[in-house]
Amino acid sequence: EGDAAAGEKVSKKCLACHTFDQGGANKVGPNLFGVFENTAAHKDNYAYSESYTEMKAKGLTWTEANLAAYVKNPKAFVLEKSGDPKAKSKMTFKLTKDDEIENVIAYLKTLK
């Protein structure tokens, strides 16, 4: 289990592209409030790529395992889960340290 307070600090690295507040604006990436245990591409007011809408159609949910794999390597995750060989992700930033990943996921779990 991660540490949500530590995860909130780590999430500051994500603020260039994401917001975390309920009802917060989308930026380059979607607002992440309520992402945990939600389906991929769940924000109605964000223009997701076809790869993400394909993952949604396949029923992909943002579980701990999926979030961890995604933040480690977004492009590889989207390629694998969407089944689209041309899949892309705007997210180029990666979290590489397991403790940071666990902490960010713990923080995302509190945003509901």
From Swiss-Prot:
Binds 1 heme c group covalently per subunit. It comes from Rhodospirillum rubrum. Cytochrome c2 is found mainly in purple, non-sulfur, photosynthetic bacteria where it functions as the electron donor to the oxidized bacteriochlorophyll in the photophosphorylation pathway. However, it may also have a role in the respiratory chain and is found in some non-photosynthetic bacteria. PANTHER family: CYTOCHROME C (PTHR11961). Coiled coil: none annotated. The keyword Transport applies. This is Cytochrome c2. The keyword Electron transport applies. Keywords: Electron transport, Heme, Iron, Metal-binding, Photosynthesis, Transport. InterPro entries: Cyt_c-like_dom, Cyt_c-like_dom_sf, Cyt_c_1A/1B. Heme c binds at C14, C17, H18, M91. GO terms for biological process: photosynthesis. Belongs to the cytochrome c family. The gene is cycA. One of its GO terms (molecular function) is metal ion binding. Pfam families: Cytochrom_C. Signal peptide: none annotated.
